[in-house]
Amino acid sequence: MKKIFLSAILAGAVIAFGGTVFLSVENTVVGSIFFTIGLFVVCTRGLHLFTGKVCYVFDNDMAYAKTLPVIWLGNLAGTSLIALAEKCTRLVSLSARAQGICELKLSEPLLGAFILAVFCNVMIYIGVEGYRSNPHELGKYLALFFGVCVFILCGFEHCVANMYYFAMGGAWSGRAVLYLLVMTVGNAVGGVAGPVARKVLSR
């Protein structure tokens, strides 16, 4: 479990780096493209990212499910550590943009945040499953690329990315925690929707 937690911290860190790139550029299309570095490293290095691992909870035993809270906490630690470190550098200037993003996210009705989180992890599943199952190398990476770019450009809610934005924007509050939990549940629902649909259609 310790190795899983450490792997989850690293996963949170690379997602935070993706978020850093997104905050650093004005063009959201460019930002979405380079945000893909996070999921790319997670998949190629086998790191533990909650939004990816939760997709396969029904394909594994209870021991697998018990690792998910550990992974979530590790992701939170990783994103928070990167945000804290960045605030000790000139990258602290990114906090203003992060604050604006957080204000927008926290102004969404809870139902809306949940739905956007469901949609997000449908895209994550498409990306991760495409990487896992596509026999062609180019196809693997295109799956990651399109899955991430679509969820970002559509404004869908990714709980781990939001951990970073909340930390960088100094937006943590009871309301932010509530929203993050709702988004986490939405990500879980969206993540399992793909595998469940695949099983139903294959009968």
Locations of the language-model features?
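Alpha-helical transmembrane segments and their helix-helix packing motifs
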Residues: 1-203
